[in-house]
Regions:
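P-loop/Walker A NTP-binding region and its immediately flanking N-terminal helices
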Residues: 1-174
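Single conserved hydrophobic/aromatic residue that forms the stacking wall/gate
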Residues: 178-189
């Protein structure tokens, strides 16, 4: 029997060039990878289903790629890329704040920031639905965000930017994602 895979995961873009409708963001992220001038925190904002988590994962992979392409894409062949694609990366952590929103989960995650990366240059922490964190969790996270280790990059994703503390927002590079306009049907145009 074949293993069932949700189509959204099966067909999830694996590189910037596969992402549809976010050209401004993917160009910016590619240029960031090419230049090597990374912020220590990014906040991806936009409605549900526009690709915030997908772009965060692609960016995390590209950040740690040992041989990025000339246009800022991950090579897909180095040990770091393979480990990420196979789900065995020790340097990229994902937390779904919708179901792990307590102070204990954030403190556990922040403990991981102390340990330098084993493969690749950075430890990347993706916190999805970051607006769901409790007040205490936000405060615990803020301590690390204020003075992060040099080997740590945070990528936060949210549908509700207004629920995030201003002190968190001020420490992030904000990246907006938009819904793509529906393709027009030539028969009705």
């Amino acid at each position: 029997m074949n293993e069932y895979i949700v189509s959204a995961r099966k067909y999830r873009p694996m590189k910037f060039s596969d992402v549809v409708g976010q050209d401004a963001l993917t160009t910016t992220l590619r240029n960031t990878v090419k230049s090597g001038k990374l912020a220590h925190a990014y906040l991806f904002c936009g409605p549900r289903g526009v690709g915030k988590t997908t772009c965060a994962r692609i960016f995390a992979k590209a950040i740690n790629c040992e041989h990025p392409t000339d246009n800022g894409e991950a090579c897909g062949a180095c040990e770091s890329c393979k480990a990420f694609e196979e789900g065995r990366s020790f340097n990229i952590f994902e937390l779904d704040a919708a179901s792990n929103n307590g102070v204990d989960q954030i403190k556990q995650l922040m403990e991981q920031t102390r340990i330098p990366p084993q493969v690749g240059r950075y430890k990347v922490f993706i916190i999805d639905e970051v607006h769901m964190l409790s007040q205490q969790a936000f405060n615990a996270f803020l301590k690390t965000l204020e003075e992060p280790p040099a080997h740590v990059i945070f990528i936060l994703a949210t549908t509700e930017k207004h629920k995030i503390l201003p002190t968190i927002l001020s420490r992030c590079q904000i990246c907006l994602l938009y819904t793509s306009p529906s393709p027009r049907d030539p028969k009705t145009s």
